[in-house]
């Protein structure tokens, strides 16, 4: 689980407006933070299949949000990808 202070920083860094918590950019950034936090856990606990299912669900949800953002506004999509460092 992400600490609320880290979550607030992520929201502030990616928000489009003052109280924006629901835009695709914020949602993708929060999912990315959670995924990055869980990744080391699976390097040490390779057999945690139940947890891996949750991780894959988060990755899938992030992918769907990114696909939506790419279809709606490609400029925002490319800016977000560059900011989060998701694509090589």
Swiss-Prot record:
PROSITE patterns noted in UniProt: RIBOSOMAL_S15 (PS00362)
Please name the Gene3D superfamilies in this protein's record.
Answer: 6.10.250.3130, S15/NS1, RNA-binding
Q: Which CDD domains match?
A: Ribosomal_S15p_S13e
Provide the protein name: Small ribosomal subunit protein uS15
Q: Which family does it belong to?
A: Belongs to the universal ribosomal protein uS15 family.
GO BP annotation list: translation
What assembly does the database describe for this protein? Part of the 30S ribosomal subunit. Forms a bridge to the 50S subunit in the 70S ribosome, contacting the 23S rRNA.
Purpose of the protein: One of the primary rRNA binding proteins, it binds directly to 16S rRNA where it helps nucleate assembly of the platform of the 30S subunit by binding and bridging several RNA helices of the 16S rRNA. Forms an intersubunit bridge (bridge B4) with the 23S rRNA of the 50S subunit in the ribosome.
GO cellular component terms listed in the entry, alphabetical order: cytosolic small ribosomal subunit
Q: Which UniProt keywords apply?
A: Ribonucleoprotein, Ribosomal protein, RNA-binding, rRNA-binding
- Report the SS bond pairs: none
Pfam families reported for this sequence: Ribosomal_S15
What NCBIfam families does the record tag this protein with? S15_bact (TIGR00952)
Q: Which InterPro entries match?
A: Ribosomal_uS15, Ribosomal_uS15_bac-type, uS15_NS1_RNA-bd_sf
UniProt GO MF annotations: rRNA binding; structural constituent of ribosome
């Amino acid at each position: 689980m992400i600490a609320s202070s880290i979550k607030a920083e992520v929201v502030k860094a990616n928000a489009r407006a003052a109280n924006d918590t629901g835009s695709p950019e914020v949602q993708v950034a929060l999912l990315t933070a959670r995924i990055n936090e869980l990744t080391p856990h699976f390097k040490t606990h390779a057999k945690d299949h139940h947890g891996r299912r949750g991780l894959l669900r988060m990755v899938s949800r992030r992918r769907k949000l990114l696909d939506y953002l790419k279809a709606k506004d490609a400029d925002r999509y490319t800016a977000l990808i560059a900011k989060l460092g998701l694509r090589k």
